[in-house]
Amino acid sequence: MAANSNSRVASNHTSKKQKVRRNIHPFTNNTRIKRASKIVKFNDSGEGDHVSDQRSNKENVLTYKSLKSRASDLLKMRETLPVYQHKREIMSYIESNPVTVLIGETGSGKSTQIPQFVLEKLYDTKKHGSIAVTQPRRVAAINLATRVAQEHGCKLGEQVGYSVRFDNTTTTRTRLKYLTDGMLLRELMMNSDLREYSVIVIDEAHERTVLTDLILGFLKSLIQGPRPDLRIIVMSATLQAEKFSEFFNNAPILFVEGRKFDVKQYYLKAPTDDIVDAVIRCCIQINQGEELGDILCFLPGQEEIDKAVTIMEKIAKYVSDEAPVPLIVPYPLYAALPAVQQSLVFAPIKGFKRKVVFSTNIAETSVTISGVKFVVDSGLRKVKVWRHQLGLATLLTVPISQASAMQRSGRAGRESEGKSFRLYCESDYVKLPKQSEPEIARSDVTSPVLMLKRYGVDDLLNWTWFENPGKEAIVMGLQELYELGALDTRGKITKRGQQMALLPLQPHLSSVLIKASEVGCLSQVIDIVSCLSVENLLLNPSPEERDEVNERRLSLCNAGKRYGDLIMLKELFDIYFYELGKSQDASSERNDWCKGLCISIRGFKNVIRVRDQLRVYCKRLFSSISEEDEESKKIGEDGELISKILKCFLTGFIKNTAIGMPDRSYRTVSTGEPISIHPSSMLFMNKSCPGIMYTEYVFTTKGYARNVSRIELSWLQEVVTNAAAVAKQKVSDSK
C-alpha cells in the first residue's frame, strides 16, 4: 500500500472492487521512534469513583487541578501517536462522510484518540449529543474509558464513562461512553433511533462478533431512515476493511500506520501435546536466557490460564533461588476477571522481576500492556460452535488464523524489538486460515432474532444483515423463540418475548427467570442463574487434591448430591452469602473457604455483582421479588422447592435433556444421541437418574453434559406436552 497521504478517491470508471481497494487514504508515520511512550497504568477507579458532596471546595479544586495536570502530562505522549499526527485530515473525512472506515494498526492510538477528536469537535461547535464507542469485550471498554478519562482530565463517570453488563459508571454529564456491543444493542431496544448519540464508533470491527455484525446492520438502517445526521466510524486493526466499505456504499477507507519494531519469530520443531506445560517451559527459558522485559502468553481459555498462573506461582520462587534470574510474577487476564484484578496487569512492577501475563485473545488488539518484549503463542483459542442438528452449542479449542497470529506477535514489538515464540511448527502456520471465521457463521442466532423482533423487524431473511446467517439458522432461531413463548403463531413478539429481550441474559435463561417469577421461586433462581453467568466458578483441583476437594464439596451439598449441579451451586451460594457473610472477618473467612473448596474467589465476587443487577432488572419487570427473610431464600433440602426450581429450568432447557437407558447410559430426548455426564458433575457417579437436564454441552473425545441436574420423567412429560406440538410446526410457514 502506498504511503502517500495525498492519494485520492479512485475515479468513477474503475470497477467496484478496484474502487474500494483504491479508496484508501493512508496516513503513515515515517519518523522512527526510538522508544514508544509508555502506557500509563490504568487507575482502578471503575467502582464509582465520584467526588463526595461532603468534601470541601478546596479538596475539589485540588482534585480538579491534579486531574488537569495529569491530562497535560499525558498530552505530550498523545501527540507522539500516529493517529494524533493526522488529526486534521482524519477529522475532515469524518465530518464530510456519514460513514468512515479507519484501519488503525496496533499502536496507532485509534481507540483512545479518535473518540476524543470527535468530542473536541462537539465542544467546539457546541453541538448536542454524545459519542458511543463499542467494544467486543468488557475489559477493553473499562480500561479504555479509564485511560481516556485520565487523558481528558476528568473523573471516570463525568465527561467520560463506561457501560458494560452489570456495571455502569456513566452519569447525565457523560458525553463519551465506552460500552460493550451488547449494551448498545440493549439501548437500541429501548430507544430505536439512538437520538442520544451524534457519533457512534464501532471499534475492533475486525473481530466480527455476532453483536458487532448486528449493530452494523442496525446502523445502516438508521442512516438510511430516521437518522441521516448520524456519523458512524468503523475502526479495524487489520487490512481486511473492504467489506465494511462496500456495506456502507463504498465509504472512504483511511489507513494509519502503527508503531512497529522488528519481531523475530521462533517455531517448535515438533508439535506439543500439553500446551500449558509448553508455555510454562518457554517462559522459564526466556527468563533464564533473555534480557529483562515482560512476557505475554496467549492461552485458549480461562481454565488453562488459571492452571498456568497456579503452576507459575508455585515454581517462580524456586527458579529465582536456583539461579540469578528475575523473579517471575504471573498475572491472569480474561474477560470474566473483575476490574480490580485486571488493573494489576497494567501496573509496572518494581525490582528485579519479570511480569508474565497469561491471557486469552483479549490481548490481541483490545488492550495494551506496557513493557512486553516477548510473546508466547499457543496458537489456540476457544470458540462456541452451534450445532444446528442437535440444537446445542459445543465449546471447542481450535487453531487461530494467520491474522490473529500476526496480531499476537506484534504485541512484542510495540516499544522495542521483540521476540515471538510460536508453540507450533512453521509448516502448521502456513496451513492456518488467513482470517478468522465470522462468529455469526458458527453461532446460534436465537438471541439476535429476538432483538430484531423486539425492534419490530418482520422480514428477517431480507433485513440489512452485515453477514446473513442463512435461512436455516434464522428459521431455527424463530422456532426456538416460539417454543420459549417469545413469539406467537404469526411470528410476532409476545409480552413474554418483550420481557426476555430486556433481560441481559440469553433467551433460555431469561425464560427460566420469567417462569420462576410466575411460580414463586424467583430469588432462588436468580442466585443460580448468577452462578451460571460467571465462567469457571468452580475450578479444577490438581490431581493430588481432586479426591479431597470433591469430598469436601459433597459433604456441604446434601441436596446437590441428589439433585445435581444447579442445586449444588445454590447450596454453595447460600453458605458463601448467608453464613460466611455475617462475621467481622467475613472477607478472610470467605477467601479461606473458597480456597479449601477450589472455588474462584474472584468468581464469587462477580456472582454477587451479577445477582444484584439481576434483582434490579427483575424488580422492574415483574415487581414480584418479595423481601422475605434470609433463611427463606436459602434452599436447604426442601424437596418441593427444589422440584419447582428445576421445573423452571426445564422450561428453558427442554431440548437439553436426556433419558437414562437400561445400561445406565443417557441418550438425548431430541435426537437420541448418546451423551455422558461430565466428570466434574455432582452426578458423575450417580447411575440411578431416570433423566438429566444440562445447560452446557462440551465435546472432547465424546459428548459431555455439564451443569447437570436430575429430573423425573413425569416432569419432562409435564413440560414437554405443549412444546412437542409446537416443535412440529414450521415457524417460517406462519410468516
UniProtKB/Swiss-Prot annotation:
Protein EC: 3.6.4.13
Biased segments, Polar residues type: 1-13
Top-level taxon in the UniProt lineage: Eukaryota
Any further remark recorded for this protein: Present with 721 molecules/cell in log phase SD medium.
Keyword Nucleotide-binding assigned: yes
Protein name: Probable ATP-dependent RNA helicase DHR2
Biased composition (Basic residues): 14-24
Record Gene3D superfamilies: 1.20.120.1080, P-loop containing nucleotide triphosphate hydrolases (3.40.50.300)
Classification via CDD domains: DEXHc_RHA-like, SF2_C_RHA
Residue ranges of the motif DEAH box: 203-206
Function: Probable ATP-binding RNA helicase. Required for 18S rRNA synthesis.
